[in-house]
Amino acid sequence: MFSYPANDEDTYLSWYKDSFSSVFVATNPFIKIPDFPLNSQGEWMPDEVNTIAKQRGVETGVTCREISELCGFSSIAHVNRALRLTGSKRIVNDLACSSDTEKMLGVCKDQHLFVPDEGYYSPLVQIALARFLKQLGHDEVIVADQFGTSPRQMRSEEFLLPEDFVPPEIYTLDKSAYLSIYTDYHYFLVCQSERSISVANPMDYFEGFFADENTNDLWGVGSLGDNLNGN
């Protein structure tokens, strides 16, 4: 079936060209719940925070664009680069920027913001996913764990349940849409056929940008000097 690109250098549109006409790079929002203590750096977001965020909804979300402005960054690409030194920190030094990470974490501490977990859909994204799939007319989808393991069917409305976990890989039964978040990353890919995107445009549901012919997993790491994505 479908899979996430094998290498960072593989461009999204080329990788999926035989199945999809567009790829949208979507970001996970940060979460603001003032009445719950922040987790320590490197720890997963508490389950209780995920549950509360799903219950309270969009009011708990802070977009990467807003984080970029709070940090004084020039684009959300800098937010992505800063996030890569949280969690597992599986990134080579040349592609990271510790000063940006420190600045972002300082802002999150001052603003009482929970940093999104790598490799998982934010609770607010899970709500948006349910709306997105409903608009596409898919009451049931196939979900799978990382690398496409353990595929099974799941009802889209279950994405809304506070206690439910949405696996990292999702594709529709008619194979017109595929979504995936890689284990080390904080953003996810929304791949669609022309007909699918004519019914539900991901820009109406998620923060992010459409990939061009050069976009790959290096869009938000490294020097960022010539990168026009994630502006």
Model-derived features: positions:
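Generic alpha-helical propensity signal that fires on short helical segments
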Residues: 33, 62, 159-161, 197-200, ...
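Sequence-level detector for tyrosine residue identity
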Residues: 4, 12, 16, 120-121, ...
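Alpha-helical context
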Residues: 108-109, 119, 155, 159, ...
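Sparse, context-dependent recognition of short Cys/His-centered cofactor- or disulfide-binding micro-motifs
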Residues: 5, 15, 52, 126-128, ...
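Alpha-helical oligomerization segments
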Residues: 179-231
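Extended, low-hydrophobicity segments enriched in charged/polar residues
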Residues: 1-157
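Amphipathic protein-protein interaction modules
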Residues: 139-196
